[in-house]
Design a protein with these regions (language model features):
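Cation-handling catalytic/transport regions enriched in His/Asp/Glu
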Residues: 1-237
């Protein structure tokens, strides 16, 4: 259940990083489904505003992401530390009159992933906004998010909130283990898929002359080393 997952994730961050989340209905939001939370450090120091935008609606794109509306920076003259405003955006199924918003395991993992990105922004403490939060080298930007993902299969974390929405039964350890055991399914294919993206990027962005050839043939040659399934004709990656 979404509300329980949110409590679990916020509680995890509180235990790991000694921070607290306080809902503030006085902060303006851009849609009635959005909630705003102020984030505070262990000594009560204000850290950030976090917006949660969990449900689909007309005009909202699909997927999940973190957005920084206002980055962190420090005024060199006054020393004032301007704190960030960030949002985590999902497309979880809305609750109905008869059923709360229920999440799949993948959606819980996605929640943790985007929440990890938001923590990267929330903990920023730099002089320049251009170097704070997720404004880092791209090979590092996914580290905080993927670190947080790992807790999705930690029983100690799951036992703080993961209960059946009707019976209250705690998630069985056997089910958690089955999720862990299945985590390597198709992992080699997923790896090759990412390799193919890299091969194609390198093929296009290492060129130093205009391209005037056959795009489909060029792309096919670029990622042919990582291709294991039949090619769908008349398509490009």
């Amino acid at each position: 259940e979404l509300s329980k997952v949110k409590e679990g994730v916020f509680g995890l961050a509180s235990r790991l990083y000694d921070i607290t989340f306080k809902k503030n209905p006085g902060i303006p939001v851009y849609h009635k489904d959005v909630e705003a939370y102020e984030v505070f450090d262990k000594d009560g120091t204000y850290l950030a505003v976090l917006y949660t935008d969990f449900h689909p609606r007309a005009g909202k794109r699909s997927g999940a992401w973190m957005t920084s509306y206002k980055g962190q920076w420090t005024d060199e003259k006054s020393g004032e530390n301007s704190r960030p405003h960030v949002s985590i955006v999902m497309n979880f199924t809305k609750p109905t009159q008869n059923k709360p918003a229920l999440l799949t395991f993948d959606e819980v993992e996605t929640f943790l992933h985007e929440f990890g990105h938001s923590l990267h922004e929330i903990f920023a403490n730099s002089t320049y906004e251009s170097l704070s939060g997720t404004n880092v080298y791209w090979d590092f930007v996914e580290l905080p998010s993927q670190f947080m993902e790992n807790f999705a299969i930690e029983k100690e974390f799951l036992h703080t909130f993961a209960r059946h929405y009707q019976t209250g039964e705690l998630i069985p350890d056997e089910l958690v283990q089955r999720i862990v055991d299945s985590s390597n399914f198709n992992v080699a294919y997923a790896c090759l898929r990412q390799v193919s993206f890299g091969l194609l990027d390198m093929a296009w962005y290492t060129r130093n002359t205009p391209f005037e050839g056959d795009v489909k043939a060029y792309e096919k040659k670029a990622w042919d080393k990582a291709q294991i399934l039949p090619v769908v004709e008349e398509t490009c990656m």
